[in-house]
Amino acid sequence: MLLLTFTLPVVTLLLAHIIRSWFRLRHIPGPFWAKITDLWREHHYIKGDYGDRPMAPYFAIPSLLGMESAMDQIQQELEDQICRRVTIDVVLWMRLFSLESLHWIAFSNKLGYLSEGKDTDGILSILQSKFIGLAGQLCGWIHRTTLRFHFPKSCTGTAVAPSQRKASHRDLLAHFMDASQKNPETLEERGVLGATISTIFAGTDTTGTSLTFFMYYLIKHPAALARLQEELDSAVRSGNLSYPPKWVEVSTLKYLQAVFKETLRLHSTARMSLYRVVGPEGLDLCGERLPSGTNLGCFGYTAHRNEPIYGRDAALFRPERWIEASNDTLLSMERASL
């Protein structure tokens, strides 16, 4: 009975997906199976020109810097909310900030998370449950179906509306729409919405978590906090740090960058094994011979605590390692960072 209860909804979803796919593709001439599956799309992925390539320029630093000023008001709103409180839930507020920021960058629209101080329509709850990630691991059709049913309409509605008109300024949606118009065969219009929403899903949890641990380690290590405060104060006194701070300014603050790198080293946002394919010559690793074509993966937790690369104190939070390292050692540490 329990097995039937579980399998019946799955079979129903599978049949619904097949029927929907058949009606969507039935007019396309070609092999029979092309009418009930979109596996034929895989040649775009093999060629490397499906989706990612048309959008890649918009994730480059020059393009992202064009959105920097749009973040100032979100940053100011976070500061105002924090100043009104004696204590704050850092985990919650960093996630609210990252979600509000990414939604503003993507759609030029505020969700009201910071002003309300809570998860108003349940996006954070969805991320916390890992529902979308698990569904995506199971099967593509489950992922597409569940994403459609569970993503709040407050976001999808905001995303769809601008697609009917010219964007007033250059947010991510406007950039992706341009990419779709220039590359209609490799980036469909419906893919624009998916790509924009995926950016929010991918960035909210990782950004919020990174900011949370950034503050956690500074609070836990007063000496590091004091050194960072001195660097910031010195930059302000010398006129090298404005308010709100700019990326070109903070990117030159060595200790600040070291703290960020050390935080991401100890708490990487990549919580999965990132695979690489062994080259034609094969690979000898830990006494084992791995043949060409083997998928070899390693978790960031393990790679980032590799003592031959990061030192005997690799398990400790010590931002100074990024400043004291020789050029060769620094290059090795950065290459090992996942």
Curated annotation (Swiss-Prot):
This is Cytochrome P450 monooxygenase easK. Pathway: Alkaloid biosynthesis; ergot alkaloid biosynthesis. It comes from Aspergillus fumigatus (strain ATCC MYA-4609 / CBS 101355 / FGSC A1100 / Af293) (Neosartorya fumigata). One of its GO terms (biological process) is ergot alkaloid biosynthetic process. Its EC number is 1.-.-.-. Ergot alkaloids are known for their toxic effects on humans who consume contaminated grains or livestock that graze on grasses harboring ergot alkaloid-producing fungi. Due to their strong affinity for monoamine neurotransmitter receptors they may also have clinical uses such as treatment of migraines, Parkinson's disease and cerebrovascular insufficiency. One of its GO terms (molecular function) is heme binding. InterPro entries: Cyt_P450 (IPR001128), Cyt_P450_E_grp-I (IPR002401), Cyt_P450_sf (IPR036396), Cytochrome_P450_monoxygenase (IPR050121). It holds the Pfam family p450. Its cofactor is heme. It comes from the Eukaryota. Belongs to the cytochrome P450 family. Gene3D superfamilies: Cytochrome P450. Induction: The expression of the ergot alkaloid synthesis cluster which leads to the synthesis of fumigaclavines is positively regulated by the brlA and stuA transcription factors. Keywords: Alkaloid metabolism, Glycoprotein, Heme, Iron, Metal-binding, Monooxygenase, Oxidoreductase, Signal. It is an enzyme of class 1 (oxidoreductase). Residues 1-16 form the signal peptide. Glycans are attached at N240, N327. Cytochrome P450 monooxygenase; part of the gene cluster that mediates the biosynthesis of fumiclavanine C, a fungal ergot alkaloid. DmaW catalyzes the first step of ergot alkaloid biosynthesis by condensing dimethylallyl diphosphate (DMAP) and tryptophan to form 4-dimethylallyl-L-tryptophan. The second step is catalyzed by the methyltransferase easF that methylates 4-dimethylallyl-L-tryptophan in the presence of S-adenosyl-L-methionine, resulting in the formation of 4-dimethylallyl-L-abrine.
